[in-house]
Design a protein with these regions (language model features):
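Rossmann-fold cofactor-recognition segment
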Residues: 50-67
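Conserved glycine-rich Rossmann-like NAD(P)H-binding loop of the short-chain dehydrogenase/reductase
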Residues: 27-44
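C-terminal helical subdomain
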Residues: 181, 197-232
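Residue(s) in the substrate-gating loop at a strand-loop-helix junction
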Residues: 141
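Conserved glycine-rich cofactor-binding loop
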Residues: 13-14
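Conserved mid-core segment of classical short-chain dehydrogenase/reductases
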Residues: 70, 85, 91-107, 150
Length: 249
């Protein structure tokens, strides 16, 4: 089913993006990869080639440069000769206290985690609607379900991204383009190094990658990864505010 799939991954050097790309590569997909670091991107591309993928485009770019978004999408579309799957997977986990002390850091994190991701989705959707086909996935987070004291700067961006993806998906209904919102919990990636996390709640990145791949191929509208987070977050959302405010987790 996946052989020859034309896949664009934005933020291709992130841990989650690499895990998804490995699954597509093993199925013989053709890949276009975009990320900030040219050196890291080359390393990722080499690994995917060994695994069976055909990397037809590598592009080092600052994804916060909004003016480049349509050009990046157009280059990938041309190199791949179409777009079957687009995955928007870049992001960062900012230091909450640093963002509280310096609002410029908070704004910079929102630019990465929300603004650039949202505008990339629009640029990709614009191209995919013409073909009347395709899956547009975006990596949001369970952190966007309810703001918590230790990561509400990050969580607020992901909440906005989730809402944006929901609205975009509704707008694209009937066009042949499906929007998939991906909501991981904590995942064992470099972004989580140094964070104080309950190890029982941290998911293996390859398990997450396989689940995201399946969601993209099925066109699932919303996917929690791992699935237990759907029920965990349902409980957290339902907590009365006075109880929620007393908790620290």
């Amino acid at each position: 089913m996946n052989g020859g799939r034309r896949v664009l991954i934005l933020g291709a050097t992130s841990g989650i993006a690499q895990a998804v790309a490995r699954v597509y590569a093993a199925a013989g997909a053709r890949l276009a990869l975009v990320a900030r670091s040219r050196e890291h991107l080359a390393s990722v591309a080499a690994d995917l080639t060994v695994r069976g993928g055909e990397v037809v485009l590598q592009r080092a770019a600052d994804l916060c440069d909004l003016a480049r978004h349509r050009t990046l999408i157009a280059e990938a579309h041309q190199a791949l000769e179409g777009l079957d799957v687009v995955l928007v997977a870049h992001g960062l986990l900012p230091d909450q206290e640093a963002c509280q002390e310096d609002p410029r850091k908070a704004v910079a994190s929102w630019d990465v985690n929300f603004t650039s991701a949202a505008t990339l989705m629009e640029a990709a959707a614009e191209r995919m609607v013409v073909a009347e086909d395709g899956v547009l996935g975006v990596v949001s987070s369970v952190a966007g379900e309810r703001g918590r004291a230790d990561n509400y700067v990050y969580g607020s961006a992901k909440a906005a991204l989730t809402a944006y993806a929901s609205g975009l998906g509704q707008r694209l209904r009937g066009t042949g383009v499906t929007v998939v919102t991906i909501k991981p919990g904590p995942v064992d990636t470099p972004m989580m190094v140094g964070r104080k996390l309950n190890p029982r709640l941290v998911a293996d990145v390859d398990v997450v990658g396989r689940r995201i791949h399946r969601a993209l191929e099925r066109g699932e509208r919303v996917v929690y990864v791992p699935g237990k987070w759907r029920w965990i977050m349902a409980v957290i959302r339902a907590l009365p505010i006075r109880i929620f405010e007393r908790l620290r987790f």
